[in-house]
Design a protein with these regions (language model features):
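Conserved catalytic core of two-metal-ion nucleotidyltransferases
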Residues: 1-23
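Histidine (H) residue identity feature
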Residues: 6, 48-49, 119
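Long, contiguous, structured domain-core segments that constitute the functional module of a protein
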Residues: 16-71
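Conserved nucleotidyltransferase catalytic core and NTase-mimicking acidic/glycine-rich helix/loop elements
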Residues: 54-165
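Non-catalytic terminal regions of proteins
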Residues: 159-195
């Protein structure tokens, strides 16, 4: 039921299928019919995932990340899915893909996030673009730091930085509370004559 903390809901609406496979959907706001083709988006997601098997899991991570963005309006999950289609690579490691996504999406969001099928225009006309862009830029900085830490073999630091970006649900080692243990002394080896 909707009154639960995490309800499972399904939206159902009447549609009329057109000859080109697009759908006519009634809009109560405009009192007109809107054209859409959700099957196009589904196919694009399938193709991207076929090329890079981490696509769908990363999209889920990004949709969860958006809920922590402070914004005048709630960011629709479809906005994140379309940005992922536009900005996630089709190969590579997950950390590098996230780094690339946040950097590219911070630019892309300024151009508007539109229906990839070309029917509806902007997906979320009331999107707080400035807030989302700022959050994407901050995320890009954190992703850069995490990737740089990993490149320096500071995996604990990298994991903590990813946790800073994605929240406490992201697993990371505990922060050090004391100084590092000193390195064991290196014995002095001298070359002395034998015999």
């Amino acid at each position: 039921p909707p009154e639960y903390e995490h309800p499972f809901t399904v939206d159902v609406m009447p549609v009329v299928r057109q000859a080109d496979n697009s759908l006519l959907i009634p809009s109560t706001r405009t009192r007109q019919w809107s054209t859409a083709n959700p099957e196009y988006l589904i196919e694009q997601v399938r193709l991207h995932h076929e090329d890079w098997s981490f696509f769908r899991p990363i999209v889920r991570v990004l949709k969860n990340w958006r809920t922590g963005v402070t914004s005048e309006t709630r960011i629709k999950s479809l906005v994140m899915e379309v940005l992922a289609l536009q900005c996630l690579p089709r190969s590579g490691s997950r950390p590098e893909a996230l780094r690339q996504f946040f950097t590219a999406a911070a630019v892309q969001v300024n151009l508007g996030v539109e229906d990839p099928a070309g029917h509806c225009g902007l997906i979320q006309p009331d999107l707080d673009t400035a807030a989302l862009r700022d959050a994407l830029l901050d995320a890009a900085d954190l992703a850069d730091r995490a990737c740089d830490q990993a490149a320096r073999n500071d995996t604990d630091g990298a994991q903590r930085t990813w946790q800073e970006l994605f929240g406490p649900d992201f697993p990371a080692p505990a922060k050090r509370t004391g100084p590092r243990a000193p390195a064991a002394p290196v014995p002095l080896i001298t070359d002395s004559p034998q015999g």
